[in-house]
Amino acid sequence: MLIPPINLHAWIEEHRHLLKPPVGNKCIQQDGFIIMIVGGPNARTDYHYDEGPEWFFQLEGEMVLKVQDDGVARDIPIRAGEIFLLPPRVPHSPQRAAGSIGIVIERVRLPHEQDGLQWYCPQCNHKLYEAMFPLKNIETDFPPVFDHFYRSLALRTCSQCGHLHPAPERYAAVED
């Protein structure tokens, strides 16, 4: 049975209150493609690794897509009305401004593929930690990996320069 068309503007207005921290992300379809509406602000310090491409369409406001490009950290600004196709296997960290709303489309993962979350030292860009896992549900699979990294001083301390990667406030009292 075919799913009827979704009035995207009406959907956003009806669900705008859900497109805010701490999650800010709502999946509207998962049949062949994962289609998400994402709102800002956010303050992610992780980089997502996806075996497939990701398509970004910025509807309202602006975002910066931080990427690791051949070992170099780069910023790619994406403004309202702009689209960007991120190639497969490029670590990326979406930074969304307050009040911004965008669409992200990813393909459903193939059975053998794994997603990853990576963290890099903000001082010297050395990779601090990487976790690879089969992604089933982006809203429930990411938080345990975030918890593992942010609760560990050892994982957050750069072996190259000694800098301690910052953790969100909610982790301040639970560090090892």
UniProtKB/Swiss-Prot annotation:
Cofactor(s) for this protein? Fe(2+)
Protein name in UniProt: 3-hydroxyanthranilate 3,4-dioxygenase
Keywords in UniProt for this one? Dioxygenase, Iron, Metal-binding, Oxidoreductase, Pyridine nucleotide biosynthesis
Enzyme Commission (EC) number: 1.13.11.6
Top-level taxon: Bacteria
Organism of provenance: Xanthomonas oryzae pv. oryzae (strain KACC10331 / KXO85)
Annotated positions binding Fe cation 2: 121, 124, 158, 161
Residues binding O2: 44
Q: What class of enzyme is it?
A: oxidoreductase
Say which family it is in.
Belongs to the 3-HAO family.
The record's free-text note on cofactor binding: Binds 2 Fe(2+) ions per subunit.
Reaction(s) this enzyme catalyzes, per UniProt: 3-hydroxyanthranilate + O2 = (2Z,4Z)-2-amino-3-carboxymuconate 6-semialdehyde
- InterPro entries linked to this entry: 3hydroanth_dOase, RmlC-like_jellyroll, RmlC_Cupin_sf
Subunit: Homodimer.
